[in-house]
Amino acid sequence: ALKFDFGSLVADGAPLRVVGNLPYNISTPILFHLADYADKVKDMTFMLQKEVVMRMVGDPGTEEYGRLSVMLQYRFNMRRVFDVPPGAFRPAPKVMSSIVRMVPRPAAECTAMDYALLGKVVTAAFGQRRKTLRNTLRDYLDEADFAALGIDPGLRGERLSVDDFVRIANHVAAKGPQPA
């Protein structure tokens, strides 16, 4: 699943509907791989560990909000549909599960000039959660850049919206070549 070309399943331009019970230990890499096919998908519905779903749908300023939240919410409108208790399985797992529905956002709403750069900026911002943006994004932005963006460099990444991250990435992309 991590190397499969999901685009090869698209027939006559009909979008895919992806449904599954993802292996909890590799769910995040699978979700990132599937995000690359958002333009070929009508919707996706998965059962995952509840903790992962809460991170996927996390809001800015919450403990759950992080890299997974930003990168998936950039590409998808998501909602937790319902929880599945351990007792629904035999043998019962030690964790609660949740069902999440993911619908790709229209391409017009996905305005990052460079998706890979967006990923790098988000990864940097959340790489050290307790550090401020001034420190985590110092390879990308200086004080003048923060001022131009209207973003307080004293904030932490968890306080920024998905759109804030897109604005930062687009600003950085417009400045030219970036660090490796």
What spans do the regions from the language model cover?
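Catalytic cores of RNA-modifying enzymes
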Residues: 1-123, 147, 167, 177-180
